[in-house]
Amino acid sequence: NRIHQKLVMELSGTLREYIKSQHGSCEIYPAPFAVFLGENTPNYVEPDISVICDKNKLTDKGCNGAPDFVIEIVSPGSRKMDYSTKNALYSDFGVREYWIVDHAKERTTVYRYEEDAAPIIIPFSMPIAIGIYQNLSITIAELLE
């Protein structure tokens, strides 16, 4: 839907501008973009937004291995997949940080797997610090204005 697309565009743009301003080398790919999590597996996921910092993982087909940062924007049909199935996959295969942006609940659930911490639930009105980028925080409500 429109809000889903707006969030993908705004989040991708914010991340891209930050990476460029820091002369970073990470790359951002919005869906459709295939992420092959297991070696020699034909199965893949298509996160709404993938941030990949190891360019050796990038191929013409997508990304082989876990992105550093993944954002999923919940749509009515993806709720269980985003909160359960993909959460387990991303944790198991080495994604460093995973956000579930839930417009219906106006909150973002943040998983920082490398810190082995409990998820943090942040309302859209509050800034969210990005674990892999120490100096960047994003307030989802501001992206929707």
Question: Can you describe what each PLM-predicted range is?
Answer:
Residues 1-145:
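Gly/Pro/Ser/Thr-rich low-complexity, intrinsically disordered segments predominantly at protein N-termini
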